[in-house]
């Protein structure tokens, strides 16, 4: 692997920008502003140099697997395309949020197993550091044994506890939403109704199942999240099980309870871009402004983290270092990845070179992931290294 020196850029170092050179050797940042034996030099004049985005919740890959209801594409094709999209949008660490529900179809046991196996097989070929985030529907009681096996075997990188049962039952009375659920499951309406009835009938078994799975995850050292917490009491109950991340808390009191309790909170970056949630729930930009949002995730749209960070700056909600922490250092800290999310010697070399001339439309010029230059627009900026002195910033 070649050695690379990045010169002339405005480099994000903690809470400030500095005119320093960044030296990459192998998979890591070797040094800042020091002489090096780099074989290649990147002219970053006029560009920002930022840590790569760490996206802990994204399910946009599902649209590559099933772009329309009932239309399936091979998982390897879907993963390769999702990887390309993630990288070109600055996401160098991606957690594919995979729902394992009691439903057949896209969110079935078979699909979860196939996706996990595909990620494990393809991981060495993928450009982004690709991890498996299992979204466990807690009413899916039959999955408990296998999930615990996967946790013990180290196959799950992140585990979320989801419960969409109430909304599923409520949506049965709305024809359009009902049809969408039935199509996704790939069964008849009568069969879907039967499945829902069976699941609801066992709801008394769910709390103990959550406790057992959480105990296994703790022992395995796997970070856990709870999804759509709706009361401070529910958040407190999950915290008692070492579930340290509140993912999309649906109201301000619950988000505040999470932050006050030392937890991380996750909101959707698309929510920031669109000015609100597509579900009509919490407005993410308001949560950011009130200090109640720790992390922004791509959710269903890979371009969103990059754009949302710059949108928050443009709207005078945060400074860029503060906004960038929401998509890089904070998510890295939340999942225990101490080797990324910051530009410093010894850190993993995940770096973005960004043209910010248009404040709300940042353009990624280059992406370095794990020390590899994996995306480049403007090859003239990459040269054979000459003298070890730095270029002056433009």
Positions of the model-derived regions?
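Hydrophobic faces of well-ordered beta-strands that scaffold small-molecule active sites
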Residues: 52-56, 94-96, 130-134, 157-163, ...
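Glycine-enriched alpha-helix->loop->beta-strand junction motifs that scaffold or abut catalytic
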Residues: 153-157, 238-245, 260-266, 291-294
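Metal-associated gating/positioning segment near the N- to mid-region
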Residues: 44-115
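His/Asp/Glu-enriched, well-ordered alpha-helical/loop segment
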Residues: 261-271, 275-356
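Metal-coordinating catalytic core of metallo-dependent amide/deamination hydrolases
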Residues: 100-229, 299
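Histidine-rich, glycine-flanked metal-binding segment
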Residues: 1-50
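Active-site glycine- and acidic-residue-rich loops that bind
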Residues: 134-145, 229-233, 237, 245-247, ...
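C-terminal cap of metal-dependent C-N hydrolases
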Residues: 9, 26, 329, 345-394
């Amino acid at each position: 692997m070649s050695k690379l020196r990045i010169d002339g850029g405005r480099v994000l170092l903690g809470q400030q920008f500095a005119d320093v050179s960044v030296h990459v050797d192998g998979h890591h940042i070797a040094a800042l502003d020091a002489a090096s034996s780099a074989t290649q030099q990147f002219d970053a004049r006029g560009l920002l140099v930022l840590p790569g985005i760490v996206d802990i919740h994204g399910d946009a890959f599902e649209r590559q697997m099933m772009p329309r209801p009932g239309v399936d594409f091979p998982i390897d094709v879907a993963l390769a395309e999702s990887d390309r999209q993630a990288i070109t949008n600055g996401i160098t660490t991606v957690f594919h949020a995979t729902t394992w529900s009691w439903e057949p179809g896209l969110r079935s046991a078979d699909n979860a197993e196939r996706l996990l196996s595909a990620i494990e097989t393809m991981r060495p070929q993928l450009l982004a550091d690709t991890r498996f985030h299992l979204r466990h529907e807690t009413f899916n009681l039959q999955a408990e044994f296998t999930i615990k096996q996967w946790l013990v075997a180290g196959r799950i990188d992140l585990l979320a506890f989801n419960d969409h049962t109430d909304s599923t039952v409520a949506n049965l009375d709305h024809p359009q939403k009902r049809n969408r659920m039935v199509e996704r499951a790939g069964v008849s309406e009568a069969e879907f109704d039967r499945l829902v009835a069976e699941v609801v009938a066992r709801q008394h078994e769910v709390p103990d199942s959550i406790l057992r799975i959480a105990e296994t995850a703790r022992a395995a050292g796997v970070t856990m999240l709870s999804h759509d917490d709706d009361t401070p009491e529910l958040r407190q109950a999950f915290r008692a099980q070492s579930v340290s991340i509140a993912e999309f808390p649906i109201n301000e009191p619950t988000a505040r309870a999470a932050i006050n309790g030392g937890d991380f909170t996750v909101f959707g970056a698309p929510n920031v871009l669109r000015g609100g949630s597509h579900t009509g729930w919490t407005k993410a930009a308001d949560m950011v402004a009130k200090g109640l949002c720790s992390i922004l995730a791509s959710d269903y749209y890979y371009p969103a983290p990059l754009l949302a960070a710059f949108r928050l700056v443009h709207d005078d909600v945060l400074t860029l270092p503060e906004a960038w922490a929401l998509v890089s250092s904070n998510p890295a800290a939340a999942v225990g990845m101490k080797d990324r999310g910051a530009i410093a010697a010894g850190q993993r070399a995940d770096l973005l070179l960004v043209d910010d001339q248009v404040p709300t439309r940042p353009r990624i010029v280059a992406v370095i992931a794990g020390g590899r230059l994996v995306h480049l627009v403007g090859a003239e900026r990459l040269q054979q290294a000459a003298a070890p002195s730095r270029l002056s910033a433009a």
